[in-house]
Amino acid sequence: MSDELIHVVIALGLVISFGLGAITAGVLR
């Protein structure tokens, strides 16, 4: 894998994790 692709995958993972965390926090509250 190229470094750029790895960075993109990591960035997407962080965005998805953050989004799910925000949604979960919103639902729990």
Curated annotation (Swiss-Prot):
The keyword Membrane applies. Keywords: Host membrane, Membrane, Transmembrane, Transmembrane helix, Virion. The keyword Transmembrane applies. May initiate with G9P the virion concomitant assembly-budding process, by interacting with the packaging signal of the viral genome. The assembly-budding takes place at the host inner membrane. In turn, G7P and G9P are present at the end of the filamentous virion that emerges first from the bacterial host. Belongs to the inovirus G7P protein family. GO terms for cellular component: host cell membrane; membrane; virion component. This is Tail virion protein G7P. It is a single-pass membrane protein. It is found in: Virion; Host membrane. The chain crosses the membrane at residues 8-28. InterPro entries: Inovirus_G7P_2.
